[in-house]
Amino acid sequence: MLGSFCQRYPEIAIELEIANREKIVARLRDNEDDLYVMSHPPVDMDLVIRPFLSNEYVVVAPVAHRTVGRRLTLRELADESFLLREVGSGSRHIIDEHMLASGVHLKVRLSLASNEAIRELVSSGMGLAVLSRHALGEHPERDGLAILDVEGFPLKQPWSVVHLRNKVLSLPAQAFLDELLNSEPATSGPLPE
């Protein structure tokens, strides 16, 4: 999406900051940027929220893990060690909310700020993870990962483009917003979290 926009408008300089949800919300409160892409916008702010891409969170394991190919309950997940995104990330927020509502507590072995690091550690057998399907690419099995069949998953939380309701968007920001909302959605590929 960004690449096609930059090709269409080569004179527009883009500044892109990738951060976790906590930092993005702070930047949003301080009105530091034109637009924000996030999966879990805050509910306590007056925002314009425009979903533009479906986003599913799935449970992943190493391809040879004993749970691959079985239907699992959420309670069975409580027996596993998990590698999750750090507290403050949108992914972690969504996962924690879902597990709390389900009455299940996950054993978090390691919290990381990188989806790539989590993928690599899961494929090496260090534990399971919950990741956005976009973070897995088109063929997770090529990276030694399997998507598990777990009750209550996938968790669906769309990616949205967000700005303060009273924000007057610059012409370049409005052009990018229009491009984003009118483009064909990508089926895979990493997005910021």
Where are the language model's segments positioned?
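Flexible hinge/capping segments at coil-to-helix
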Residues: 46-82
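Short beta-strand->loop
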Residues: 48-58, 133, 142-156
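Residues embedded in well-ordered beta-strands
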Residues: 35, 51, 58-60, 81, ...
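Hydrophobic residues within well-ordered alpha-helices
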Residues: 28-29, 77, 120-126, 161
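A ligand-binding cleft/hinge motif common to bilobed small-molecule-binding domains
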Residues: 22, 37-46, 97, 101, ...
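Ligand-binding clefts/hinges and TM-proximal coupling segments of bilobed small-molecule sensing domains
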Residues: 88-104, 171-174, 178-193
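A late-sequence structural motif
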Residues: 146-189
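Central regulatory/effector-binding core of bacterial HTH transcription factors
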Residues: 1-45, 105, 112-114
